[in-house]
Amino acid sequence: MKVWIDVLTPKQANFFSVFVARLREHGHDIFVTTRKYREVEQLLQIRNTNATVIGRHGGADLSAKLVESSKRIADLAEHVTKKKPDLAISFCSPEAARVAYGLGVPHYAICDSPHAEAVCRLTIPLSRKLFTPRAVPKSAWKRYGIASPNIARYNALDPAAWIHAYAPG
């Protein structure tokens, strides 16, 4: 299966680096995108996860955020169209959710932050499934229009995905 993963933050770089390695071990073809963000790019490099840098964050200004997000959507659409993934996975990346939806690619969201209203409003309704820690009640997600059967909960907090790989020095 060909899987597209979009990584936006240092936490996501840690989380998805382990995730990418496991998917590859199971024979999946993975391609990763990120936006221009020095810490994310460095973490992905340290963790041997190749990523294509597409776009940047618009900063604190709402207008700049909107413009940069729009540019990134257009650039991602072009890139992803060429790659032809079977599914997309992101930690609620608005651009990944929008591009996947627009291209008819199922988007699977991972999120532990139902309080991040803007991001959730832009991603959850476009996602086929939401994966979230069991500590977050399903009811916290319902206001974003996702049906309870489409919410999968796991028994861990997200750092558990990468912390176990490190032995005390």
Feature annotation, model-predicted:
Residues 87, 101-114:
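Active-site proximal beta-strand in glycosyltransferases
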Residues 108-109, 120-132:
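A conserved, positively charged/aromatic
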Residues 1-10:
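Nucleotide-activated donor-dependent transferases that construct or modify glycoconjugates
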Residues 2, 86-87:
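Structural motif
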